[in-house]
């Protein structure tokens, strides 16, 4: 599986300190999702004639409430295979071929629901209703103060992280697998009630995963509230191109199409500034190994995050709904390569600074500090409290809609 994007997108565009934009791909139009199937037998969506792609459904586990969790295996015609579940829309496994055609699982996660219900750092999850942090769990809309549960205290400063302790990553979503030619995927839907985790308004949400024959994993987010409410959806998949639980990601080379960032305070809350990355360890406008500068002494931003855990502002963000390149990731040893394209204005780069050996992965091996990284497309953290940031307040009846693609290949 050779890289089909590199020369066009990263080879030329990034060397010129910029990123290209591309038209948003057309996604299949899935049917409305039914209730979660209460079955345990394997089911297979009818494959298209002569297609190498397929979707298989099977029982995964029951959660602590006794609810059934189903697994959907998306086998792409281009060689990528994904196992996803309807508990939080989590990606449990992601098999990526290397430069020799050998596939490995390259994402962090657990073999059972119990792992996700106890020590899970959002592995592979849909994040909502608000991805990233909201300072002190407070925000104001039209003079009304809304109080959210605080579930994170970096630097001893409380915040609401990723939608609260019972965010959308903990929901059993309705799920409908589909196949449209060589495109395979799952449509996840859920209803978040008014007052869910303290947020105002009922929200009808739909997240569509599509795996294409070009080895593109497309995520389309849609949400419609009935009251003004902040919405900021993302995916929290962790990557390690060495393979799951196989060392750290410090030798991975990262490029970010971002010449600015939003610096944070000791609580990892943005200060409201947007500052250039030039001349700092945060300058990834050209490729750098993640371990090259992550422990730079005297850099307050790295000290606050115990490494990289920051929002980067895209240099050339999406216009008119077109996808813009946000990042590229490369592992020279395996040859695995990925690009991230999005309609969002920012991307959170997190290099696994809070992973510990208390988290035991799918191979029975403990995860290492910095044993995985996340590239989360998003609006900026704490936007409801930062008037200078692009707004995340969605109006009643307004359709919130964003798209992100993870494009996999080798070189």
How should each PLM-predicted stretch be described?
Residues 1-8:
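Bacterial N-terminal signal peptides that target proteins for export
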Residues 23-80, 86-411:
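An exposed, glycine/acidic-rich loop-and-rim segment of catalytic or binding clefts
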